[in-house]
Regions:
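Beta-loop-alpha module in the N-terminal Rossmann-like domain of NAD(P)-dependent dehydrogenases
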Residues: 43-107
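Predominantly a Rossmann-like dinucleotide-binding segment in NAD(P)-dependent oxidoreductases
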Residues: 121-182
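Residues that line or immediately flank small-molecule/substrate-binding pockets and catalytic motifs
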Residues: 28-30, 52, 69, 146-149
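N-terminal Rossmann-like dinucleotide-binding module
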Residues: 1-42
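Short, Asp-centered acidic motifs that coordinate Mg2+ and/or phosphate
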Residues: 25, 64, 144
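Rossmann-fold dehydrogenase core element
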Residues: 103-120, 140-145
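Short loop/turn motifs at secondary-structure junctions
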Residues: 20-22, 42-44, 61, 138-141
């Protein structure tokens, strides 16, 4: 659900590792992104949707759902997909409120479903190297870490001034979008 930047990155894994994963459906309100991803992954017409609700109103047709929608749209599709028996790969943050997060957790437990949260920085070379240094003990016993993630101008202007996160009422505040990284 969602064929934008993140959804395309995760779908790219299916292209690289076709024995591990196959994209069998796509939902995106943007016709260009929908068509592009659907054609790239040979998704049949009956599994192309312009809304996540359309996709989840269809009888279950996959093992898992990737939810890479805007932050404020994580809860409802996640709860619906879990109730249908899907496993979930969920873009961070899980949801905007603590209650929504615990609802997702509780339903996943009830349905014995996996909800994997995409903490993408965990796999960035910088953080891998930092963890190796800490784990090696070369710098002694760690007492505290203070980390600043500078947001480059182009990313800030694109995402937080003009882009998807320009208005906290429409998505989530920048502190939630950025501070939920691992």
């Amino acid at each position: 659900l969602g064929a934008g930047n993140r959804g395309s990155v995760y779908a790219g894994y299916a292209k690289k590792y076709p024995d591990c994963m196959k994209i069998v459906g796509v939902a995106d309100k943007n016709q260009f992104r929908l068509k592009s991803m659907a054609e790239d992954h040979d998704v049949p017409e009956e599994n192309r949707f312009t809304d996540w609700k359309e996709a989840l109103n269809k009888t279950k047709f996959a093992d898992a759902v990737i939810i890479s929608l805007p932050d404020n749209l994580h809860y409802d599709p996640c709860m619906k997909a879990l109730s249908m028996g899907y496993h979930i790969l969920l873009e961070k943050p899980i949801a905007p409120t603590e209650k929504e997060c615990t609802d997702i957790r509780d339903l996943a437990i009830k349905k014995n479903a996996i909800v994997g949260v995409c903490h993408v920085l965990r796999y960035a070379p910088y953080f891998i190297a930092l963890k190796q240094i800490i784990d090696s003990g070369d710098i002694g016993q760690l007492i505290s870490i203070q980390h600043l993630e500078p947001i480059q101008y182009a990313h800030m202007a694109h995402s937080y001034v003009r882009g998807n996160w320009h208005n906290s009422k429409e998505t989530t505040p920048i502190i939630l979008a950025k501070s939920c990284h691992d």
